[in-house]
Amino acid sequence: MIIRSPESEVKIMVDRDPIKTSFEEWARPGHFSRTIAKGPDTTTWIWNLHADAHDFDSHTSDLEEISRKVFSAHFGQLSIIFLWLSGMYFHGARFSNYEAWLSDPTHIGPSAQVVWPIVGQEILNGDVGGGFRGIQITSGFFQLWRASGITNELQLYCTAIGALVFAALMLFAGWFHYHKAAPKLAWFQDVESMLNHHLAGLLGLGSLSWAGHQVHVSLPINQFLDAGVDPKEIPLPHEFILNRDLLAQLYPSFAEGATPFFTLNWSKYADFLSFRGGLDPVTGGLWLTDIAHHHLAIAILFLVAGHMYKTNWGIGHSLKDILEAHKGPFTGQGHKGLYEILTTSWHAQLSLNLAMLGSSTIVVAHHMYSMPPYPYLAIDYGTQLSLFTHHMWIGGFLIVGAAAHAAIFMVRDYDPTTRYNDLLDRVLRHRDAIISHLNWACIFLGFHSFGLYIHNDTMSALGRPQDMFSDTAIQLQPIFAQWVQNTHALAPSATAPGATASTSLTWGGGDLVAVGGKVALLPIPLGTADFLVHHIHAFTIHVTVLILLKGVLFARSSRLIPDKANLGFRFPCDGPGRGGTCQVSAWDHVFLGLFWMYNAISVVIFHFSWKMQSDVWGSISDQGVVTHITGGNFAQSSITINGWLRDFLWAQASQVIQSYGSSLSAYGLFFLGAHFVWAFSLMFLFSGRGYWQELIESIVWAHNKLKVAPATQPRALSIVQGRAVGVTHYLLGGIATTWAFFLARIIAVG
């Protein structure tokens, strides 16, 4: 008799045709809410429609349905991303000087937009070199395209069309996985399977295929371009892929095929998988052979990581077990219950992801200039400044979003009855200690960092430079930062003997790299001025964290309002009967946190912009003499508030203020208009709802007199809506003002 083990049944993880596709539903605004679907009585309706359209929690309490909506929306998001990418590549193919730039990247600026000659705006088409007139772009796409081996505009066209096809495919997938084959809740909660697929598939195979592309296509094409070969003479990508002898002429180890791999003689491949460090002196970018090696290594790591978790085969880690075993001597139940939180609250999940993604986006901002990855990126100062600023803002917004969704989790998804003595419960129980200590740290940092500047302003005003904190008087050197720099500069001879240079020239020790008479990168000196502004960074970051963390930890209750959880995520005040309870909702903490995030990031990008112009960016003469854009004035000028106002804001705003009548005049108009948008926000932030309602009643009376009153009653914005509109215009106006100021300046002088 043969005893067979029972066959494990394959679980069916999708529902077929769960929701029929209906254009009638689609055409009925607010179909997701009984109240909104009735149509507008007052103008508040349109605001509620926008506020709740994507708040899937408010449509239904069924977690499976919510999960499906989020999943479907992700495909819509991907579709928009592909559409945007397609547009970028199409502009490169149709309206750009990419081929001209490729032939002479040091003298020709990148442009992919030509303004039509209407109302005289053709003045905006400046001469970017090589006889091409257009708007100079600072997105870094040209440098990225060169690094990936794109040599002509036809290839850009094909990629643009491919991206459109993918956009359509994503739209279809979003519809299909909601209406035709919708995953069950168990599928969304199968974290081990998800980890395996995301790690091995997205990150592992993704990195591996990119490494493959770099080795077989990017490296040989860039080798030819660096040698000055005309792009039209370079073999096409498929010729390198199909013809190994062609690659072997450039990288001899290709002739040996896979033999060195299987005989473990891996060092043979060092000609195209290198470990050099530093920058390529021809392009001022990281060595592309280093980058290929990096992606191959990352691929191996993630392919291994993608096989660690227990799925159908019964071997590997179980995430629930890992979390529940995570206990220390002082942490009570540790992470017990965290698995349940993260598989039933997508807000908690999203909060963690936003915090990590935001942090890594800020890390990207800092690496883009210190280790410029693409050819000729380092000498395109406008692009350098834009990429840093962009990634800093994005990172700031994502981190505030992390706090927002953590607070929504606390209000909507946290169940205090089932949580006892786990880490989250312990944090909540000593939240007063956390917040009061953090508050003390903020006060300390604020008074001391600002106090150092005020001292300097006072001494400067009284004509006592010898009593100022500066590199030439009372020194406050950032000794820890200098030690970190020094350690990394010495790494190639000590901790990384295989490397020929340190990871970044900014650490020091190395020589400068100049390309086409412009500085790509050099060791960045840190002194008293940096010590001062770094403490302003510490101050603004801690205040942002204080506001956001207070919002999360007190989202459900506080001494002032013990029943806050019942009032929800956003509410203006605790009813008319209790004074002094406004701006206590979790939503209000996000609102207030956004302003401090704006403060924090502004100081960072101002510091970066001035420091780079003063100590890094500039031209180099044939004799090797470096002339920086602002002549190294950062160390002595930025140590007073007056110096920041006079030598940074005012002195460097001259380009945008004087841009009228030149090809930069659009930035002058934006500078003006964005100031206006910013000022407009104050109207919403400083005035109350009653003021506007009173005005509206008067205007409605006039309409009634003339018999032109609308059927929908006008209503003043609610308090929360007014704050939302206010902070949006504040941030939008502030960011656009900064953008115009930075770009007009750097395009003019860079």
Curated annotation (Swiss-Prot):
Phylloquinone binds at residue 692. InterPro entries: PSI_PsaA (IPR006243), PSI_PsaA/B (IPR001280), PSI_PsaA/B_CS (IPR020586), PSI_PsaA/B_sf (IPR036408). One of its GO terms (biological process) is photosynthesis. Keywords: 4Fe-4S, Chlorophyll, Chloroplast, Chromophore, Electron transport, Iron, Iron-sulfur, Magnesium, Membrane, Metal-binding, Oxidoreductase, Photosynthesis, Photosystem I, Plastid, Thylakoid, Transmembrane, Transmembrane helix, Transport. One of its GO terms (molecular function) is magnesium ion binding. It is found in: Plastid, Chloroplast thylakoid membrane. It comes from the Eukaryota. Chlorophyll a binds at residues 683, 691. It is a multi-pass membrane protein. Chlorophyll a' binds at residue 675. GO terms for cellular component: chloroplast thylakoid membrane; photosystem I. Pfam families: PsaA_PsaB. P700 is a chlorophyll a/chlorophyll a' dimer, A0 is one or more chlorophyll a, A1 is one or both phylloquinones and FX is a shared 4Fe-4S iron-sulfur center. Its EC number is 1.97.1.12. Belongs to the PsaA/PsaB family. The PsaA/B heterodimer binds the P700 chlorophyll special pair and subsequent electron acceptors. PSI consists of a core antenna complex that captures photons, and an electron transfer chain that converts photonic excitation into a charge separation. The eukaryotic PSI reaction center is composed of at least 11 subunits. This is Photosystem I P700 chlorophyll a apoprotein A1. It comes from Calycanthus floridus var. glaucus. The lineage of its organism: Eukaryota, Viridiplantae, Streptophyta, Embryophyta, Tracheophyta. The gene is psaA.
